[in-house]
């Protein structure tokens, strides 16, 4: 019976593979992401073909079937021919995949010694000898670990890894590695630039779109193990019984790939709709008249809801909460604290192993005149008061996903509370899905940022991976850039940011350059000239974007609402801290927000010696200069040029870089798939126009205050 089932699986895999080959013949539309396995490393192809001719996957679970399918399709594409063998022929196989216990049970001569700290998701890829035969073993403590190892093995064949005497061990540095979807139930995606939501709520639970499994497959290939399905501005209906059945159907589809589902919840969900005017923002689905977290009836409602959820989804991950922020309800409405609200939900989830991710994105103007200080002031005094299954989830910077910010001082400031880092994969402030901006470089700058919370070496990475404060649980979240566009992300190169997030979430020690190289070789090909030039393009693209948008620490000077183009002149908005002039503070004397000890004293929220460094105009890193200081126009920079001249230089440098990317891409025309080439060319042309608009708009506006000539160092 098992042989017959395997044959059917092979037939389905071969048919699927034939369809993939045929679709590739008409061009790369981006749907296959980095998983097409179309580009083996030619320098090692002969070695690969000699060493890998047969495969056995031990086990018959759905996860094992997926491993079998992935290796069959991937190795056939890369090597030309592969034989999938039954477990009974394990001794004859070149590649063996299975949990250590299962491998040992089948062949007592093979007793994989896995590292004791491999955990439930780590894996080992190792050469071994069975009699006279040299084989390779992919093993783990669990089938999910074997799945991760199998995807990594396919990656190795495309990035030039020799298989001779290979011994590789990999384990995730962070426990919860999540995507956050800002998807609304009506199909719209907040800050989404790649079409509508993937989730077809109107068809669920009866119809499971094949794209859901492709989504899970892509995430599993880079180690993402959880997804928050809906917007943090949560519609209470997501907790209704009919929607929970839909969520359960998605959870069933994702589970074999090691992916758990989470939900954003509205704090007012227990309230009856009749008690609120704006149902989607404040009203609920319950029968109560309030959602005070200390009210026993409110606590009971959440406990009963948790029982309902876990009956449908036994491995449900937990709740993400946006509370008392931008109009969303929360515990402060009842005179309670953020800890009171989070702990109520944590109590409901704790019996089932669920977690609460309570966002620190709050900026009540009554807390402090400086928006950048508010989250710290609200949350740091609560350190140690959150339940053990609560994360405080903080954005990387203290304002809002700007092109560049210093790290939020809350990181390092709450040693007794697990902190989850929230990054934004979607490019809300970095050109949407039009601009080529590789975010791996940005995220590495943040992860390597030294908070000095416990002296030198207290990096952001060490805070979120638990090593600095010995946190009992660790997490990282990425606000996704995925939609129902054929290529998933709107821009072909935006796929690299999804990929980079997953790889860094698994191992933040990887370099941005290594990750870019992996993605290029799997997505575009192996040509060494192409790989080198595209890597160079990607590695400088984020700094270029900062330069043509918000250089030297400028921030939040974009279009109101849409956040795409420049609007430094914006001075009227529903809130003062939604205007541009609030942040740049340009006047006849200079430019920048004074957050020094003589200004708002935001520098005081950082540990020494950072606080002193940021406080000093002379030694403050110039990339943060206008974030922390109001600087005279004629101030002499490290280059010897004035602030005004340096501002001009940065804006022109940014646009020059985009011009260079266009030239480089044109040189690669014959080395890139025609469909990809045309798609990216069109995006780059628009990026060139946009970058010039940013430069000219901002310099012309700031010139009104500096009264100095716009200069370009390259033409002076």
Q: For the regions a protein language model found, what residue spans apply to each?
A:
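Extracellular/periplasmic catalytic domains that process cell-envelope and extracellular macromolecules
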Residues: 48-49, 88-89, 129-132, 171-173, ...
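Acidic, contiguous N-terminal accessory segments
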Residues: 21-133, 163-165
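Feature activates predominantly on carbohydrate-active enzymes
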Residues: 60-70, 74, 111-318, 350, ...
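Catalytic-core regions of glycoside hydrolase
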Residues: 203, 278, 286-517, 523-527
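Catalytic domains of carbohydrate-active enzymes that cleave complex glycans
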Residues: 458-716
């Amino acid at each position: 019976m098992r042989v017959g089932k395997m044959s059917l699986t092979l037939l389905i895999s071969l048919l699927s593979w034939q369809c993939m080959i045929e679709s590739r013949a008409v061009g790369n539309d981006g749907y296959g992401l980095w998983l097409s396995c179309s580009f083996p490393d030619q320098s090692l192809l002969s070695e690969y073909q000699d060493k890998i001719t047969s495969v056995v996957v031990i086990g018959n679970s759905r996860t094992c079937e997926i491993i079998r399918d992935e290796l069959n399709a991937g190795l056939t594409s890369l090597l030309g021919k592969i034989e999938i063998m039954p477990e009974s022929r394990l001794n004859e196989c070149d590649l063996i995949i299975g949990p250590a216990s299962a491998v040992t049970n089948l062949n007592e001569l093979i007793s994989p010694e896995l590292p004791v700290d491999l955990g439930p998701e780590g894996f080992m890829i190792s050469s071994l000898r069975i009699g006279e035969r040299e084989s390779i073993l992919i093993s783990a403590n669990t089938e999910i670990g074997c799945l991760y190892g199998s995807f990594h093995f396919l990656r190795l064949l495309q990035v030039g890894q020799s298989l001779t005497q290979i011994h590789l061990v990999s384990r995730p540095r962070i426990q919860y590695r999540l995507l956050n979807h800002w998807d609304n139930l009506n199909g719209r995606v907040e800050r989404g630039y790649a079409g509508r939501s993937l989730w077809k709520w109107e068809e669920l639970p009866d119809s499971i779109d094949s794209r859901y499994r492709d989504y899970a497959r892509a995430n599993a290939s880079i180690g993402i193990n959880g997804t928050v399905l809906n917007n943090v501005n949560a519609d209470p209906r997501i907790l209704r019984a009919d929607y929970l059945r839909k969520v359960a159907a998605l959870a069933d589809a994702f589970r074999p790939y090691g992916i758990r589902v989470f939900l954003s919840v509205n704090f007012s969900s227990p309230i009856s709709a009749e008690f609120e005017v704006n149902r989607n923002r404040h009203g609920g689905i319950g029968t109560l008249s309030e959602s005070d977290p200390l009210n026993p009836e409110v606590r009971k409602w959440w406990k009963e809801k948790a029982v309902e959820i876990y009956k449908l989804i036994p491995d449900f991950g937990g709740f993400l909460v946006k509370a008392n922020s931008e109009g969303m309800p929360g515990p402060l409405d009842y005179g309670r604290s953020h800890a009171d609200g989070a702990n109520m939900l944590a109590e409901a989830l704790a019996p089932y192993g669920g977690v609460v991710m309570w966002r620190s994105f709050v900026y009540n103007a009554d807390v402090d005149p400086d928006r950048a200080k508010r989250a710290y002031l609200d949350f740091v005094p609560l350190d140690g008061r959150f339940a053990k299954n609560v994360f405080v989830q903080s954005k990387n910077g203290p304002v809002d996903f700007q092109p560049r910010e210093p790290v939020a001082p809350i990181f390092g400031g709450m040693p007794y509370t697990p902190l989850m880092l929230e990054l934004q994969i979607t490019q809300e402030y970095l050109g949407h899905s039009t601009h080529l901006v590789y975010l791996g470089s940005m995220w590495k700058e943040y992860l390597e940022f030294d908070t000095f919370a416990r002296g030198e070496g207290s990096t952001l990475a060490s805070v979120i991976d638990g090593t600095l404060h010995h946190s009992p649980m660790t997490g990282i979240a990425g606000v996704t850039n995925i939609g129902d566009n054929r290529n998933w992300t709107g821009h072909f190169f935006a796929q690299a940011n999804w990929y980079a997030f997953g790889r860094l979430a698994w191992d933040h020690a990887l370099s941005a350059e290594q990750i870019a190289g992996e993605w290029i070789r799997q997505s575009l090909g192996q040509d060494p000239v192409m790989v080198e030039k595209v890597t160079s393009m990607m590695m400088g693209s984020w700094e270029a974007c900062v330069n043509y948008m918000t250089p030297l620490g400028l921030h939040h000077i974009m279009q109101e609402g849409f956040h795409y183009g420049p609007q430094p002149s914006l001075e009227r908005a529903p809130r003062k801290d939604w205007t541009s002039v609030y942040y740049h503070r340009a006047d006849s004397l200079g430019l920048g927000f004074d957050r020094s000890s003589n200004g708002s004293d935001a520098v005081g929220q950082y540990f020494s010696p950072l606080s002193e460094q940021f406080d000093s105009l002379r030694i403050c890193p110039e990339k943060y200069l206008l974030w922390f200081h109001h600087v005279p126009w004629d101030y002499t920079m490290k280059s010897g040029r004035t602030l005004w001249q340096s501002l001009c230089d940065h804006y022109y440098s940014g646009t020059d870089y985009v011009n260079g990317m266009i030239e480089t891409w044109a040189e690669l025309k014959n080395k890139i798939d025609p469909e990809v080439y045309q798609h990216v060319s069109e995006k780059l042309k628009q990026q060139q126009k946009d970058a010039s608009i940013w430069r000219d708009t901002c310099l012309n506006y700031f010139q009104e205050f500096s009264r100095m000539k716009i200069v370009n160092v390259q033409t002076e």
